[in-house]
């Protein structure tokens, strides 16, 4: 079925800033003695930058707070830290598109472990996946980082499962980043978010 979609990135699109960094800062503030864990984070990111280790290991090290946080704590983080960071004009745009009958997807490199607590009126949340053990989300990544072409792949998988087809001319995509050009090219209407204030303008792609 031909469907009007609105695809939204999350970091610096729906919220200002990097949600993964906010998670780490939030956890360290509550558990300052865990600061030594940052050495492991730096170590794995250095190996990643040197192309010795894959991104998965570095990102999993960064997400170590998930191993220690309960679902209630993760939800509290979303409500107390991420929700106040919303660009209100972009949130209103999302709600407007939903009211107009658009199918709304959030597609982000941020992890589903906390994105699942988003209460916005969206139809799908597609984020980087992490392992679940004994019913609890962990820091260990599963599959690829949901970025660049991976976003297109994830969107296409869900659309196919629902027997839907993107109405190219009438669909929208919102992002702050050139990394999202593959997703932006899935639709005709491409909106750039200014990271300073959330101002929306046409995303010009050559």
Language-model features: locations:
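C-terminal cap/substrate-recognition subdomain and adjoining C-terminal extension
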Residues: 1, 5, 82-206
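Active-site neighborhood of HAD-like aspartate-dependent phosphohydrolases
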Residues: 1-50
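A residue-level signal for conserved active-site and pocket-lining positions in enzyme catalytic cores
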Residues: 12, 74, 125
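Electropositive phosphate-/nucleotide-binding environments in soluble metabolic enzymes
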Residues: 17, 52, 68, 148-152
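Short, surface-exposed acidic
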Residues: 33-39, 72, 122, 166-169
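Short, compositionally biased "basic patch" segments
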Residues: 43-67, 123, 129-130
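Metal-dependent phosphoesterase signature
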Residues: 56-89
